[in-house]
Amino acid sequence: MARRGKGRSINGIILLDKPTDISSNHALQRVKRIFFANKAGHTGALDPLATGMLPVCLGEATKFSQFLLDSDKRYIVTATLGVRTTTSDSQGDVVSERPVEVTQTQLDQALDTFRGDIMQVPSMFSALKHKGQPLYKYAREGITIEREARPITVYEINQLRFEGNEVELDIHVSKGTYIRTIVDDLGELLGCGAHVSVLRRTQVADYPYDKMVTIEQLEALIEQAKESDVSPYDLLDPLLLDMDTAVKKYPEVNISDEMGEYVLHGQPVQVFGAPDNTVLRITVGEAHTFIGVGKMNEAGLIAPTRLANL
């Protein structure tokens, strides 16, 4: 999702460490104001309860946010056993309370059922839409909508800690996976119920964990700029990652400046040896300046599908 408005034409991606108890959109708007960006969008919402990596795209980078939305994610989650809630997290109402009599062997066996390609029924408390309305709005009105199970992949699900009624897990999943649903399903498999009490996203695509910054750190840079009598953007803008990092996993096709002019006008070009059946990251000239993405068409030409307006 993107928001247009007055502001700077600044392009790039900031890896925000989202705090708990605010919505992803609220966090997005704060970052947009801090950078005074004319356009901003995030790359997949985190629940208000959750913290961690929320890539915020500014300016032309918003055109490529979908690629991050479609990327793999990694989370560390604490599941509290014995209590099931309406939302499958600690912010919901308690549905049931049951004794926890789970052994390590039982937990290992239950976790193993989630590994690999599985089908998952999305939570009613999700942003998936039914007739134009997100499911969570129906859920808050006590209305249950039938949802189809969707294929997901759990690449890894590793136990970090099992103490008392708490299980801490490190989970690496494909796009569209609901961690709260995994935890709820785990609780039912164990026969005691469970809900998410702590959730932190530690990775989106291949972005490094140590590049994340908090809202407080961004605001501190503004104060530092005031004290140093420099523009805050002199301190903020270096934190931005290049917009093409959103599509870094795709093969690069480097073309001449002349061919780049054709592509920027929406025209396909011929590039010998370019791979087909994949998204292509198009760069121009010796500097390998990123201008957008494309695909090979039926005529064997590289056709642009999304271009940056630089």
UniProtKB/Swiss-Prot annotation:
Record family assignment: Belongs to the pseudouridine synthase TruB family. Type 1 subfamily.
UniProt-recorded Gene Ontology molecular function terms: RNA binding; tRNA pseudouridine(55) synthase activity
EC number: 5.4.99.25
Enzyme active site: 47
HAMAP family in the cross-refs: TruB_bact (MF_01080)
GO annotation, biological process: mRNA pseudouridine synthesis; tRNA pseudouridine synthesis
InterPro entries per record: PsdUridine_synth_cat_dom_sf, PsdUridine_synth_N, PUA-like_sf, PUA_sf, tRNA_psdUridine_synth_TruB, tRNA_sdUridine_synth_fam1_C, TruB_C
Record NCBIfam families: TruB
One Pfam family per UniProt: TruB_N
Chemical reaction(s) catalysed: uridine(55) in tRNA = pseudouridine(55) in tRNA
Keywords, alphabetical: Isomerase, tRNA processing
Protein name: tRNA pseudouridine synthase B
Coiled-coil blocks: none
Gene this protein is translated from: truB
Function: Responsible for synthesis of pseudouridine from uracil-55 in the psi GC loop of transfer RNAs.
Origin species: Psychromonas ingrahamii (strain DSM 17664 / CCUG 51855 / 37)
Enzyme class: isomerase
